[in-house]
């Protein structure tokens, strides 16, 4: 068998074993330099004549001291667990593989075991590590499978390698006390059991190995925990039918109801990109300037404008978890794409290169991201790797005029409807303000002029000129008798002259002959001559005495 194929097979089995559950987990502490035997293989199950045994390890030497504690992840059941930071863990490493009973090889011999570590061996169907070191601390797993069936993980053990205890030095002559004989004579009988003179004083017994203090129980009492498993890539040939293999498990730790949204996003993968970068910080803060305009925009998955598909669950709780709670699904109309039954997976029918892209599956619980994963779906020829970046992307330069004559500037985004409406409202308000100010100024000026005219007339200072008709409207009122004036028919229209005036405007101006037109004196009113001019016949004069009340 080709060694590369064997290594690839073992790595695949190791990954599968790490993702699978661990039905049996134990803890073991050893000291540096010991020979350790781990994970004995179970007996034959009768499912096949030959079994594959795979031992692997996930190094935990960079995670600091570890100790188990009772955790209530699924109340009321309690299991021993430990909290390990994912940043300190390394990829699983295969240690050894064996066949039980030995299987025939392609060369005619028997395939027994393969070992990839110098200090590891398979002895009596168990993994043996000679002279363990502190760097050997980790999670060791055993996976068992038949020749034609995938391996399944059956046992695991957490191995913690502690420093070796300091050996006790043998006693030396300096440890003997020369004065023990003299002091022993006067001692009380109660000390008769003490060592006699000349006996070396033994050092105190070594302290027992330090035991890790029992940690308090770890229990999640509130919130929801979401666990997601997604394949990182799916390769297809045009015309095939396949579906995404996404597994989502939600565990509620209290009796509160919650809503869960499973959102699918899609990003195009340009052929000019060597790889796609997923900026995890932008998933939680998509409106940051760095996420809106990253420097590597064509090859970055930082922000999105639309959702490909959404399946929402409402009214979920600990006793009614998804998918049993009320569900509602929406999907953009894409040919050849549909939901896989009532699950959260996508189903591709008659797949084509247009379906290729980077797909993100994001789980929201009460509008907050709780888990997410990505899948690269493409043909083998157009496959591009996806890398997850923790920091924010570099911010791209602002859009500016092109510096090269043959390179066009990217088109500016059209203004939004909200900006247009805001501009129209502001313009209308400004125009109405200008019109209102103009009307107010005109009214103010007109009122001031009218007030000045009324005030000058009412003051009685200086002459006042009025316009009257040029006809003899008051010919019958020239009598000095007050009684005659009382008999004048006021409501009768005045008699118009026989021949209208042709030299004037039809009106006459009364010119006063004294500083005051109607001077007053005690007991009587004086009469003054009024001269008309500018109309009718210039040789005609009318002498008229009247009270000032005639004009005002």
Curated annotation (Swiss-Prot):
The question of whether Transmembrane helix is a record keyword is answered with yes
Tell me which InterPro entries the record gives: Herpes_gE_N, Herpes_glycopE_Fc, Ig-like_dom_sf, Ig-like_fold
Where does the source fall among the domains of life? Viruses
Residues passing through the membrane, by range = 422-442
Per the UniProt entry, the signal peptide is: 1-20
In this entry, the parts of the chain located on the Virion surface side of the membrane are: 21-421
**What is known about its processing and modification?**
Phosphorylated on serines within the acidic cluster. Phosphorylation determines whether endocytosed viral gE traffics to the trans-Golgi network or recycles to the cell membrane.
Q: Where does the record place Pro residues bias?
A: 164-173, 201-211
Question: Which residue ranges are recorded for the region named Interaction with VP22 and UL11?
Answer: 472-497
Q: Which Pfam families match?
A: Herpes_gE, Herpes_gE_N
As for what it does, the entry says: In epithelial cells, the heterodimer gE/gI is required for the cell-to-cell spread of the virus, by sorting nascent virions to cell junctions. Once the virus reaches the cell junctions, virus particles can spread to adjacent cells extremely rapidly through interactions with cellular receptors that accumulate at these junctions. Implicated in basolateral spread in polarized cells. In neuronal cells, gE/gI is essential for the anterograde spread of the infection throughout the host nervous system. The heterodimer gE/gI serves as a receptor for the Fc part of host IgG. Dissociation of gE/gI from IgG occurs at acidic pH. May thus be involved in anti-HSV antibodies bipolar bridging, followed by intracellular endocytosis and degradation, thereby interfering with host IgG-mediated immune responses.
The record's similarity note reads: Belongs to the alphaherpesvirinae glycoprotein E family.
Name by which UniProt lists this protein: Envelope glycoprotein E
Species this chain originates from: Human herpesvirus 1 (strain F) (HHV-1)
Q: Which gene encodes it?
A: gE
């Amino acid at each position: 068998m080709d060694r590369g194929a064997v290594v690839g097979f073992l790595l695949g089995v190791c990954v599968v074993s790490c993702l699978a559950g661990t039905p049996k987990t134990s803890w073991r502490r050893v000291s540096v330099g010991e020979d350790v035997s781990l994970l004995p293989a179970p007996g034959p199950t009768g499912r096949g004549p030959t079994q594959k045994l795979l031992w692997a390890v996930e190094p935990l030497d960079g995670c600091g001291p570890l100790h188990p504690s009772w955790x209530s992840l699924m109340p009321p059941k309690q299991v021993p667990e430990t909290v390990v930071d994912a940043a300190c863990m390394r990829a699983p490493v295969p240690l050894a593989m064996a066949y039980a009973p030995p299987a025939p090889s392609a060369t005619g011999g028997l395939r027994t075991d393969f070992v990839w570590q110098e200090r590891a061996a398979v002895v009596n169907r168990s993994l043996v590590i000679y002279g363990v070191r502190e760097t050997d601390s980790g999670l060791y797993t055993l996976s068992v499978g038949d020749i034609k069936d995938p391996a399944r993980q059956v046992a695991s053990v957490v191995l913690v390698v502690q420093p070796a205890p300091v050996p006790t030095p043998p006693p030396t002559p300096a440890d003997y006390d020369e004065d023990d004989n003299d002091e022993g004579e006067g001692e009380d009988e109660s000390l008769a059991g003490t060592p006699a003179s000349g006996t070396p004083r033994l050092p105190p017994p070594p302290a027992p190995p330090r035991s890790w203090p029992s940690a308090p129980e770890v229990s999640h009492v509130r919130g929801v925990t979401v666990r997601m498993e997604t394949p990182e890539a799916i390769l297809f040939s045009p015309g095939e039918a396949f579906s995404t293999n996404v597994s989502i498990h939600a565990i509620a730790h209290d009796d509160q109801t919650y809503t869960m949204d499973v959102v699918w996003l899609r990003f195009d993968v340009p052929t000019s990109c060597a790889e796609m970068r997923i900026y995890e910080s932008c998933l939680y803060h998509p409106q940051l300037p760095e996420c809106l305009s990253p420097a590597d925009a064509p090859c970055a998955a930082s922000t999105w404008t639309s959702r490909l598909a959404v399946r929402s669950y409402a009214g979920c709780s600990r006793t009614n978890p998804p998918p049993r709670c009320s569900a509602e699904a929406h999907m953009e109309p894409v040919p050849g794409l549909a939901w896989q039954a009532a699950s959260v997976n996508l189903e591709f029918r008659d797949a084509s290169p247009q379906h290729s892209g980077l797909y993100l599956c994001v789980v929201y619980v009460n509008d907050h991201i709780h888990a997410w994963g990505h899948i690269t779906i493409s043909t083998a020829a157009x496959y591009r790797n996806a890398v997850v970046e923790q920091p924010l992307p570099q911010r791209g330069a602002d859009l500016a005029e092109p510096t090269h004559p043959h390179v066009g500037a990217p088109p500016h985004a059209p203004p939004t409807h909200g900006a247009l409406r805001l501009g129209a409202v502001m313009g209308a308000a400004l125009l109405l303000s200008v019109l209102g100010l103009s009307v107010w100024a005109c009214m103010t000026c007109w009122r001031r002029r009218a007030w000045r005219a009324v005030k000058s007339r009412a003051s009685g200072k200086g002459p006042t000129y009025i316009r009257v008709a040029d006809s003899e409207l008051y010919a019958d009122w020239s009598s000095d008798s007050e009684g005659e004036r009382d008999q004048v028919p006021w409501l009768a229209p005045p008699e118009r002259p026989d021949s209208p005036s042709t030299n004037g405007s039809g009106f006459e101006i009364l010119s006063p002959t004294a500083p005051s037109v109607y001077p007053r004196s005690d007991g009587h009113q004086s009469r003054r001559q009024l001269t008309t001019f500018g109309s009718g016949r210039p040789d005609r004069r009318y002498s008229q005495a009247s009270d000032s009340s005639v004009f005002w």
